């Protein structure tokens, strides 16, 4: 099965080792992709645990689950991954999800830092194009599966 983060790798060889705790992301982009996957498969404990120590205060898995309830995350596009310093990177991405039968995008530039030798999500800047979007049903699916949107992820609308 292809990974939920839309990489070319299978889930087992991409994000699963990070989410299961058998391995740690070696780059900010790997962490960002695994956090997206954790949202997609509803592993909110992993999302919480990968916040920076400063930002993790007061965040619970239950809070994350409540804020994401109703969202079905299905596609991710990484635009840029910038390695500015050895202990901090930024990743610009767009994540796509369905909620209440509507299509949304989250376009963010995220800041990641290294704490105790591990990459952590610190914060992000949302871009102005976040929100509900229209996407042609006959266009290629956003997940990169080489099918038309209407024959691929659009069939998963709840």
Task: Report the location of each language-model feature.
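Surface-exposed, charged secondary-structure patches
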Residues: 68-105
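Cysteine-centered loop/knuckle micro-motif
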Residues: 13-15, 150-153
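Long C-terminal interaction/binding lobes of large macromolecular proteins
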Residues: 90-92, 119-123, 129, 139, ...
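Short beta-strand edge/turn micro-motifs at domain boundaries
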Residues: 107-134
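Short Cys/His-rich zinc-binding micro-motifs
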Residues: 1-9, 137-146, 154
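Short, low-complexity N-terminal intrinsically disordered segments enriched in polar/charged residues
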Residues: 1-34
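Short solvent-exposed beta->alpha transition segments
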Residues: 49-78
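Short helix-adjacent coil turns
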Residues: 35, 39-46
């Amino acid at each position: 099965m292809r990974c939920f983060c839309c990489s070319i790798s299978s889930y087992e060889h991409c994000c699963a080792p990070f989410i299961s705790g058998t391995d740690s992301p070696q780059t900010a982009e790997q962490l960002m992709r695994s956090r997206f996957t954790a949202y997609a498969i509803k592993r909110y404990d992993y999302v919480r645990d990968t916040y920076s120590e400063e930002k993790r205060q007061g965040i619970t898995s239950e809070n994350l689950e409540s804020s994401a309830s109703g969202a079905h995350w299905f596609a991710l596009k990484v635009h840029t991954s910038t390695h500015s310093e050895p202990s901090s990177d930024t990743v610009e991405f767009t994540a796509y999800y369905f909620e209440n039968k509507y299509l949304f995008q989250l376009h963010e530039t995220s800041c990641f830092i290294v704490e105790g030798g591990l990459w952590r999500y610190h914060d992000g800047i949302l871009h102005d194009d976040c929100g509900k979007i229209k996407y042609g049903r006959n266009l290629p699916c956003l997940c990169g599966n080489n099918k038309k949107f209407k024959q691929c992820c659009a069939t998963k609308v709840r």
